């Protein structure tokens, strides 16, 4: 059985304490230039982890990922250029 996971973006003041983020979930990516980290955790624990992370002194802000709520199946529409029947002939 798979557990539902959701990501969150943690904006940091400094990267020195980035190792401390491991206890909140799987650290997927850390950007050294823009000073943020992407962390994945269980959906059930997301609100609790966000509250704890935002109270830490080295964290600027915490944003949840909206990917689980976005529809990823796209409807197939015909291309307008293919829709027209161009009769090339004399």
Swiss-Prot record:
Localization, UniProt: Cytoplasm
InterPro entries: DUF2129
Keyword Signal among record annotations: no
Keywords recorded for this protein, A-Z: Cytoplasm
Disulfide bonds: none
This protein's GO CC annotations: cytoplasm
Major site of localization recorded for this protein: cytoplasm
Domain of life, source organism: Bacteria
Family: Belongs to the UPF0298 family.
Protein name, UniProt field: UPF0298 protein BPUM_1393
Organism: Bacillus pumilus (strain SAFR-032)
């Amino acid at each position: 059985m798979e557990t539902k996971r959701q990501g969150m973006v943690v904006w940091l003041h400094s990267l020195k304490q980035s190792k401390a983020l491991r206890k909140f979930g799987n650290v997927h990516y850390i950007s050294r230039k823009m000073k943020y980290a992407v962390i994945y955790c269980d959906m059930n624990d997301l609100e609790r982890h966000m509250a704890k992370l935002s109270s830490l002194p080295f964290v600027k802000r915490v944003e949840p990922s909206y990917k689980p709520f976005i529809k990823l199946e796209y409807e197939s529409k015909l291309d307008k250029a293919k829709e027209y029947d161009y009769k090339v002939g004399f």
